[in-house]
């Protein structure tokens, strides 16, 4: 129970290349957490002293790191970690990654960097010999087939593009068939698979 912790407040640092994202995170941090510092930078360019942070976590935060920079980013993550680290990240089977790849193929001519996957992260941790444990969870995001506006907004957020509406997604020769398979028995169903990766230096 953090409210009974002997060390209060719990100082919290925020890191993101987007000032908007940092501001949004700052709004929801509540006691006993207290924002002590903010870093508007990428993880791979982040500079800190070795083992600065007792705990570091990245919850669905590493998708946009290019594949060729992912190892550097993870090394920075581990460099700053004094005790424990936690990464929650979708696998290649997850809707989030699959749909983004279809989006790149269907609307960007195949150009663009696919989201990084949990499998890539695990492979790098193995290569750099970092002890870790993994727990896989699966779940589904579902809503009525008639909830078109909600689904449109959700899919736009998945690809960070609000210029393409649901109708265009459904008519596209690549995203369309994929989305058709996400409708079953009058329900939209988006299957997710997430790897929870626990790292420790203890």
Segments from the language model and where they lie:
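Class I SAM-dependent methyltransferase SAM/SAH-binding core
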Residues: 1-46
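Residues at the starts of beta-strands that form the adenosine-phosphate
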Residues: 10-11, 84, 131
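Alpha/beta-hydrolase-fold catalytic nucleophile elbow
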Residues: 15, 59, 88-90
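Local beta-strand N-terminus motif with an aromatic residue
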Residues: 52-53, 82
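A short SAM/SAH-binding and catalytic strip from SAM-dependent methyltransferases
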Residues: 53-70
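A short glycine-rich, Lys/Arg-flanked "PGG" loop and its adjoining helix->strand segment in the class I
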Residues: 69-86
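Conserved class I S-adenosyl-L-methionine
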Residues: 83-116
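Conserved Class I S-adenosyl-L-methionine
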Residues: 116, 126-202
